């Protein structure tokens, strides 16, 4: 959760979380992981993620129990209907 920053669009005032931290495969990752960030700004994202997991707990358990292939895509697009079906969700 600390890898994201809450940003507000100056025109629409829409708030979104943007990832600012590098991923493990990125060249700068080894240096970046030495740093520690803490902010209360990530709390809304954490709450949203926990709420989604709680809301779809039965579906998640069912998919895991069935050893479903492409679990991330199914969770994101079919079960929660939160993602476009063409998106690639390898991070879940």
Curated annotation (Swiss-Prot):
**InterPro entries documented for this protein:** CNPY, DUF3456
Q: What is the top-level taxon of the source organism?
A: Eukaryota
Can you tell me which family this protein belongs to? Answer: Belongs to the canopy family.
Q: What is this protein called?
A: Protein canopy homolog 1
Q: Which organism is it from?
A: Homo sapiens
